[in-house]
Amino acid sequence: MKELSQIRKAVLGALRGAGIAAMEAFPAEQAMAYSGAVAAVGVGAASGKTAGFCHYLGEMRDPETQVIRERYGKELFGQITVELRANRAADCERGCETATEVLLGGLPEGIRTGELTWEAICWEKTTGMFLRRGVLECRALFLTESAVESGEFLDFRLKGVMSE
């Protein structure tokens, strides 16, 4: 799974866990079907850099198998975009309050949050709903390991998220 998709999936899961209907893209044809706030989540501008020397962070021993693995990491800077829509302005505001709590304190440890900004609530003619847009500046940390013997690499995974 690519890094931007992992960030988006983590944010979607956190918002859903807090009771907000959340999806990757807002389905305009279903806009009126939601009784409360619904969030569309995206990952905006992103840039990356290595963590450690050429991504290398050192060796670790697997506590179960005692196999030594090399650990690599990378860091991605980006913007998480959230668009909240609701039939009522009050629902949009409540959704924004809940989303703020989640975005600033309920994401996996691999997503380090920065500044969160929200636009004012406005009326969106195309959907006939109230809309509030937010942007969260963040950096995300990804880790991968390789077995020293085989040199095989696993995919980079967002720190703090269980692998499937």
Can you name each region flagged by the protein language model?
Residues 26-27, 65-66, 117-122:
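Short structured motifs
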Residues 44-46, 85-89, 121, 139-145, ...:
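Generic structural motif
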Residues 70-90, 129-142:
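Oligomerization/assembly interface segments of phage tail-like spikes and tubes
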Residues 92-149:
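Acidic-leaning, charged glycine-interspersed low-complexity segments
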